Amino acid sequence: MKILVTGRDGQVAQSLAERHGGHELVFAARPDLDLADPASIERTVAAVNPALVISAAAYTAVDKAEEEPDLAMAINGEGPGVLARAAAKTGAPVIHLSTDYVFDGSLDRPWREDDPVAPLGVYGATKLAGEQAIAASGAAYAILRTAWVYSPFGGNFVKTMLRLAETRDALTVVEDQHGCPTSALDIADGIMAVAAAWQTDPAHGANAAYHLAGTGETHWADFARAIFAESAKRGGPVAEVTGIPSSGYPTRATRPANSRLDCSRMANVFGYRAPRWQASLAEVMDRLLPENAA
C-alpha cells in the first residue's frame, strides 16, 4: 500500500521509516508539501495518489505559538483540513496525529477520547482546530492523540536531559505535571496497526479519535530520573534531579497538569497498546548510547 507521510523530518515520520510494515512510504515536507500553502498540499497529494495519508507534520513549538498564533493555526488548524480534503478526492483515509494539549489537565484520572476539550494555549487550540477540520473534511479518518513524545530522532526531552547532564551535575525539573512518556517508535507501531486493520476493512474504527501513549504514568522529574538511571547503566551522562513546582519554571504557554491518556479504545478497536514506558525508554536509550548498551 502506498502511504503519504507528512512531516518527513519529524520523530514520528523517521520512526515510520523503520516501522513501515512493508508498505511503500512516500515522505513529504516543505517546500514540496507546506501545510501553510494549500496549493502545495493539493499538488503533492494528487501527484502521489496515496492509498492512505498519515498526517504527522505540525507546528510543535508550544511557547513560540503564543507569539505566532496565525502561523500555528495555518499549519496545525487549517493545513490538516486541506490535506484531508485532498485525500478525500483520491479516496484515501487519513491518520492524523494530535495531542494531549487539547485538554486542560483538570481531571484527576486519565483522559478519555470523549472528555470535554478545553485547550489552555494557542498550540492546543490550533491542534483542536486541526482535529475538527479533519472530521469535517469528508475523508475517512482516525485521530491519534499522543503525549510526551521522545525517540532517537530530532529534539525531545530525553535528548535534552542527556545534553544538559554533560555540563551540569544537578538539574531542576517540574514534578506537578503528570503524563505518559511515549516513544515515537511505538506511535509508528500503533499507526501501522490502524493501517493493517483498514486494509482488511476500511470502515473498521473509522471516523473517531483514539489515544496512543506509553503505558503507565509519571511526572517530568521522575521521567528525568529514569533517563539518568538508564544512562548510568550505559556509562552515559547523569545528573541529580530536584523536583520543583511548575511555578518555579514559568513558561509562556501553560501546560496541562494532567496529560495522562486512557488508551483503552485503541487497544479494544485496533488491538494495539504501547509497551510500558520504562521498556520503551530502555529501547531508545540503547539507540542513543549504543556503545555502552546494557
Q: What is the meaning of each model-derived region?
A:
Residues 2-20:
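N-terminal Rossmann NAD(P)H-binding glycine-rich loop of SDR-like oxidoreductase domains
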Residues 11, 219-220, 244-263, 276:
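Active-site loop of classical SDR/Rossmann-like NAD(P)-dependent oxidoreductases
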Residues 21-43:
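Adenosine-cofactor binding site in Rossmann-like domains, unifying the SAM/SAH pocket
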Residues 38-77, 86:
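NAD(P)H-binding glycine-rich loop region in Rossmannoid oxidoreductase-like domains
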Residues 74, 79-82, 89, 102-144, ...:
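Catalytic helix-loop patch of NAD(P)-dependent Rossmann-fold dehydrogenases
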Residues 135-180, 184-193:
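NAD(P)-dependent short-chain dehydrogenase/reductase
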Residues 190-191, 197-251, 292-293:
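Mid/C-terminal beta-alpha module of Rossmann-like enzyme folds, strongest
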Residues 275-294:
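Amphipathic terminal alpha-helices
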